[in-house]
Curated annotation (Swiss-Prot):
Record-linked PANTHER family: KINESIN LIGHT CHAIN (PTHR45783), KINESIN LIGHT CHAIN 3 (PTHR45783:SF1)
Residue positions, PTM Phosphoserine: S173, S466, S502
Protein name: Kinesin light chain 3
Coiled-coil segments: 90-150
UniProt repeat feature TPR, residue ranges: 207-240, 249-282, 291-324, 333-366, 375-408
Transmembrane segments: none
Function in brief: Kinesin is a microtubule-associated force-producing protein that may play a role in organelle transport. Plays a role during spermiogenesis in the development of the sperm tail midpiece and in the normal function of spermatozoa. May play a role in the formation of the mitochondrial sheath formation in the developing spermatid midpiece.
Family matches, as SMART domains: TPR
Domain notes: The heptad repeat (HR) motif is sufficient for interaction with kinesin heavy (KHL) chains and ODF1. The TPR region is involved in mitochondrial binding.
Biased composition (Low complexity): 158-167
A cellular component annotation (GO) from this entry: cytoplasm
Region (Disordered) residue spans: 153-197, 411-438, 472-504
Length: 504
């Protein structure tokens, strides 16, 4: 119910709408006025009733009755007005109560909304912690699995007594922890004999003797003696045979090896470029010795981190060896291994997997699934998988390598082999024990990556004993053990036994 009143002095300006408080105040004033008016009318009605009761029949009686009726109507109107005013006041009180309740509910809604925001934030934080916990649990389970795998490797460890009796490892210029099978059974004399034929031309006996001396001095770290020896021999060869002679190229290659073992990669690279030019001119661009020199150059470029320049050299060496030796020759597999390592350092993992798969098929076809070269190739491929975070594939390869059929019997187990197999079994046990050490390092890297730790890259050690082999690229006789290559640490570089960085 609303009441419109005209404000004083606002005639002709339209009605003014009162506020609820003003309306209630004026209504109460009206109620007071009506109550006073009702009291007056009750008094007036009483006087009229007394007058009518004491008045006899006369002309004034009719007028009194008429006045009494008017007063009665006024009283009814006053009572009606009072009733409406009371209803208006009650309605106003009810509206006020509703408004107060509305404000209270709004305040409660705001408080609940704020609490809802807090609860939502707490829920998000709880969900985040839950996800982190689930990831941590998954990581710990994976880590536990690989630690169990590392524990299984320990059953093949030699006893502590034999470990203590072994001579301490050399801290010289060896670049790899895994010498090839060929180098393990060759001494300097055997190496010199193997170098008697060098890509179809005869190496003089004096050059072979000099080569053996260089091996000896380089193995002792006496480079101040080895380098002048090489340079003097190189000058003598150039005076006697001229610069463009295969013997000069061989001597350049030997000197490059010495510089490489001193980490003088630039000088070694320059010498190998010279040797490559001589061999291409004297032996032809598709001679196995040219392929070996190309491979050696690729190795040196790889050691200097220039993988993009090394890759085409390695690819050309592969093409020459495929053409000359055949696509299934072990030297082709070695070259594929080097090419895979170069691609791996450039992040070309599809090419890496393809090259390793082909090398693996060559070694399996030549030596069967138990050939140590097969295990080493699988280890290289597993390392590539680790770099791609393909932990499952890497672990499967490691387990294949460590399968019981591929491993020698643990130390202390009964020996059922014949006496004639003892030397070969010993070499095989030594080689596979080194593979196990490489696998253990790979698994430790895997666990470290799961823990978010960066695997510390070991400082590369040079390899003077690689001077011990003058690689012969002619086809090998059936049954000859093919040279194996080395498995190295991250960051991965071309290993010494795959480098063919020899004086051919």
């Amino acid at each position: 119910m609303s009441v419109q009143v005209a404000a004083p002095g606002s005639a002709g300006l339209g009605p003014e709408r009162l506020s609820p408080e003003e309306l209630v105040r004026q209504t109460r004033q009206v109620v007071q006025g009506l109550e006073a008016l009702r009291a007056e009318h009750h008094g007036l009605a009483g006087h009229l009733a007394e007058a009518l009761a004491g008045q006899g029949p006369a002309a004034g009686l009719e007028m009194l009755e008429e006045k009494q009726q008017v007063v009665s109507h006024s009283l009814e109107a006053i009572e009606l007005g009072l009733g409406e005013a009371q209803v208006l006041l009650a309605l106003s009180a009810h509206v006020g109560a509703l408004e107060a309740e509305k404000q209270r509910l709004r305040s409660q809604a705001r408080r609940l909304a704020q609490e809802n925001v807090w609860l939502r934030e707490e829920l998000e934080e709880t969900q985040r912690r839950l996800r982190a916990s689930e990831e941590s649990v998954a990581q710990l389970e994976e880590e536990k699995r690989h630690l169990e795998f590392l524990g299984q490797l320990r059953q093949y460890d030699p006893p502590a007594e034999s470990q203590q009796s072994e001579s301490p490892p050399r801290r010289d210029s060896l670049a790899s922890l895994f010498p090839s099978e060929e180098e393990e059974r060759k001494g300097p004399e055997a190496a010199g004999a193997a170098a008697a034929q060098q890509g179809g031309y005869e190496i003089p006996a004096r050059l072979r003797t000099l080569h053996n001396l260089v091996i000896q001095y380089a193995g002792q770290g006496r480079y101040e003696v080895a380098v002048p020896l090489c340079r003097q021999a190189l000058e003598d060869l150039e005076r006697s045979s001229g610069h463009c002679h295969p013997d000069v190229a061989t001597m350049l290659n030997i000197l490059a090896l010495v510089y490489r073992d001193q980490n003088k990669y630039k000088e070694a690279t320059d010498l190998l470029h010279d040797a490559l030019q001589i061999r291409e001119q004297t032996l032809g661009p598709e001679h196995p010795a040219v392929a070996a020199t190309l491979n050696n150059l690729a190795v040196l470029y790889g050691k200097r981190g220039r993988y993009r320049e090394a890759e085409p050299l390695c690819q050309r060496a592969l093409e020459i060896r495929e053409k000359v030796l055949g696509a299934d020759h072990p030297d082709v597999a070695k070259q594929l291994n080097n090419l895979a390592l170069l691609c791996q350092n450039q992040g070309k993992f599809e090419d890496v997997e393809r090259h390793y798969a082909r090398a693996l098929s060559i070694y399996e076809a030549l030596g069967g699934p138990h050939d140590p070269n097969v295990a080493k190739t699988k280890n290289n491929l597993a390392s590539a998988y680790l770099k791609q975070n393909k932990y499952q594939q890497a672990e499967e390869l490691y387990k294949e390598i460590l399968h019981k059929e591929d491993l020698p019997a643990p130390l202390g187990a009964p020996n059922t082999g014949t006496a004639g197999d003892a030397e070969q079994a010993l070499r095989r046990s030594s080689s596979l024990s080194k593979i196990r050490e490489s696998i253990r390092r790979g698994s430790e890297k895997l666990v470290s990556r799961l823990r978010g730790e960066a695997a510390a890259g070991a400082a590369g050690m040079k390899r003077a004993m690689s001077l011990n082999t003058l690689n012969v690229d002619a086809p090998r006789a059936p049954g000859t053990q093919f040279p194996s290559w080395h498995l190295d640490k991250a960051p991965r570089t071309l290993s010494a036994s795959t480098q063919d960085l020899s004086p051919h």
